[in-house]
């Protein structure tokens, strides 16, 4: 049984029973996704216009509209397909895993591959992957509220269950979807997929959240307002043209086409694509985003609460010091005292302490392979191995009876083993938790009373080790149920990551407060914080000190502190709320099952990918696959970048749409001929709205992105003069297009040549404007134009389509264009270039006024 299934048997059962998954919602097929592009309201209007054209015999217009609709549908399909593929990759990466024994070897596999009969291992923080009967259990308890609605922890035991009346209340069964709160166990899978209790009573899908983000909803609302205004403008254009004597059909088509060209119907979709691309970019940098809305929120983060171990530090623990009552030892390749190698047999307390390292652990290490388990426990295991101890020999000689796994609340771990015909208990944990339990001390070869002077010496040793930035653990043992006998201390080095130091400096420049949270000793935390460059005159607070403050007092003084030591998960929750009371947007890291409430309460919950439990990962908005603070800071930078990029392409789309509306409306009101024909407006929409806007959403962060304070979440989207710039630029585009049209007529051009001149001016001015939108703080002439090859490619493709429409005889017939003479191309060039020059002049005037203030 303890060998588990063979790989072949597991494959056979997987074929027979299917994957360990609940029924999924049907995925969008490519054909259905493509046809879905035609359900858009704007497309419906275009198709209606096509029918009108056919009925009136305008076949050229009808075919042109259909071709453009098809092209738009293809572009929309490609964008949606790429977005769906990105989100599918995200779903696969967040799929749970399980520790399973196959062919006698423990391995980690996708939970979907589990089958009946598999032997699985469960530990605190795991999400149970399938219904399973406990084979062994050590202090295990589960949260089954997802099935029963009862939030109280349910203790579980291995062995046969006598009461079988209620399938959901069996003490020897753990159920798929429930969370292990404490303890550890091995269990045999008895049901998978839809045959589990979860599968029978629920069709809930554990899927990536893809609902609309707040920004998407705001922009969708904006789109509706703009659409309403455009419809009013279209009605005005229609009646003004008819009143002037233009053909009703022509004006009807013109009005409809203005609506199609001017209404930013693709705005929410473009935001979704930009967010999905940002998520994909973050994944490549080890930041896995669970929820799209967190991408926006990350950009507003003003406080990063980071765990010390593994996030700020390397999480590569190395035991450097061992202290017993009579001696202090250093550890490198062996155990040394004053530089000379020593044998543990010479020091009974040291030998017993190393036995505790070998037995009071859940870590495993096979020589020649990487150790498996918590970094702290593996460090202790390796230290004992350096002294000649073997984990396997110790387990065989002293069989395990019972284990109380490490708990973040109690900060200690305890095991009971058979020891020379009797029972012995080993204890390890935080010094301030272990020392008060002990009444005796192993001093040399004798057990003596742990006097107050001895206690003071131990506390002094803890202080000394902590001031060297070492993580300190204490060890004790007792025979049967006797008194606890203190053994000694270990000091472990876990230095700050170089990348974390740089990340903290970046946060300081970005006006983001970085706070270190740890369960370690206050002195250790302060030493690490000093090395990492975190303090800057701020102080440290312990969990005990935090408990003496009310919520109001904590919020009032919290800005004075950069380090919180000896804290538990409940303290984390209070810290999140205290920072939120100050108005800050809080990102909180966590890895344990008890961290889930704080992760959910934080504006951005961040779980650890390596050391994090499944419960923490599912509660989090973001998962750091490398447990690295610099990855979180990169995610914050990307959050700022994506918001800036969304502002950029909204600025681009709206100013272009305003330019098109101004061109058509002013032309009609000024008594000019219709400036652009419906097919020409559709061409404008095709070449300027799609690819350039998407490419603008792929801009890299601006150099000063992390030298600005975080954005306030309640800040209006059009703050900072964005709306004024959009309207002004739209007016410039419209006026210059009208000017080009008028100049072409004055130079003796035909109406078709004037319209072609206006068409080229309108499109080229918009393609130039896309480069202006790369920055809100620099004019076009001070921007790096070549650092986004996708934008360059999009503009090149759009310009190529325009020139083809002007030069190609077949396209000339479709879009009613004519080749332009050199004077008219000069008009196009001057009109298109005048717009960014005017914008740059206005930008300089505005910047000068701001400087004077």
Question: Locations of the language-model features?
Answer:
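Long hydrophobic segments that form regular secondary structure
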Residues: 741-750
